[in-house]
Amino acid sequence: MVAITTTLVKQLRDRTNAGLMKCKKALIEANGDIELAIDNLRKSGQITAANKSSRITAQGIILTKINHNSQYGVIIELNCETDFVAKDKIFKNFGEDIITTALNQKISSLEEIKSLFEEKRITLVDTVGENINIRRINTLEGNLIVSYLHDTRIGVLLSANNISQNLYLGKQIAMHIAAMKPKYIQVNDIPSYIISREHKIQLNIAMQSNKPQKVIQQIVEGRMREFTRDISLLDQNFIIDPSQKVGQILEHYNIIVKNFIRFEVGEWIEQEEHYKANES
C-alpha cells in the first residue's frame, strides 16, 4: 500500500479544493493514485461542492422547531446563493430534515450538525448548482418556548414564565422581537463596554456642535437613553400598541421573559466575509 503523505494530500487539495480529510480518504481509497482519487471525488460530486464552497451564501431560510411540551426549541439558518433556490422545495426539505434531527437529538453544536449532514449537503449542492451552508444553530430551554417566523427570513424563539394562559400574547411578543430587533431583555442586561463605547461616540458627536458643556451633557444623556431604549425589549414601544412599553404589557399579565433568540437571513455576512478576506 502506498504511503499517503502530507505532500500527496496537499497536491490533491490544491487540484480539487476539497477538504483535507476528504482528500486523504480519497487517496487511501485510490491507493495513492491521485488521478483515480480525482475521478472518485468527481463521481461523488465532492469536487463540484468544494469548488462552490467559496461562493457567498447570503440568501436562505430560517427554521424553528419546538418539542412536544414546548420546553425546548431549535433555530437554524440555512443559506444558499439565490432567492430562487431558497424557495425551492428540495432546499426547504433539507432544512426541515436538519432541524428535526437537531431537535430530536438535542444537537446544539454547529460542527456536529454540519458533519452529520455533509454528505446530503454535497448532494444538494450538485443538484441545485449553488453553494449551500448550514450557517448557525441555537437552542433555547425554558418553562415554555414560543416561536415566530416571518416569511422564513426572520425567526424568533422566546422563553417566558407565566405565559401558558396567554400564548397569543407570547406570539405577539415574539413578532415584536422579529420586527424591532431588541438585543437585550432590559437595560441592566447591556454590557458596560457597549454603554461606554456608545457614550464615547455620542460625546464626540455632541462636542462638535461647540455648545456649552452643560448642553452637551444633556444631549448625550438624551441620546444614551434613546440608545438603551432601542435595544432593550422591555423599554421598547409595543408594536401592537405603541402607547405602551413591552414591559408594561408583560407586567400587566405577570409574564416574565427569560430569554430570546432572533435570527435573520444574511445578517452580518458582509462583515464575516470581510474578516475572512483579511485573514486570508
Curated annotation (Swiss-Prot):
Domain of life per record: Bacteria
Coiled-coil features, chain-numbered ranges: none
Keyword Protein biosynthesis in record: yes
Localization per record: Cytoplasm
Tagged with keyword Membrane: no
Cellular component, GO, one term: cytoplasm
One Pfam family matching this protein: EF_TS
Gene Ontology MF term list: translation elongation factor activity
PROSITE patterns: EF_TS_1, EF_TS_2
Function: Associates with the EF-Tu.GDP complex and induces the exchange of GDP to GTP. It remains bound to the aminoacyl-tRNA.EF-Tu.GTP complex up to the GTP hydrolysis stage on the ribosome.
Name of the protein in its database record: Elongation factor Ts
Source species of the chain: Baumannia cicadellinicola subsp. Homalodisca coagulata
Gene coding for it: tsf
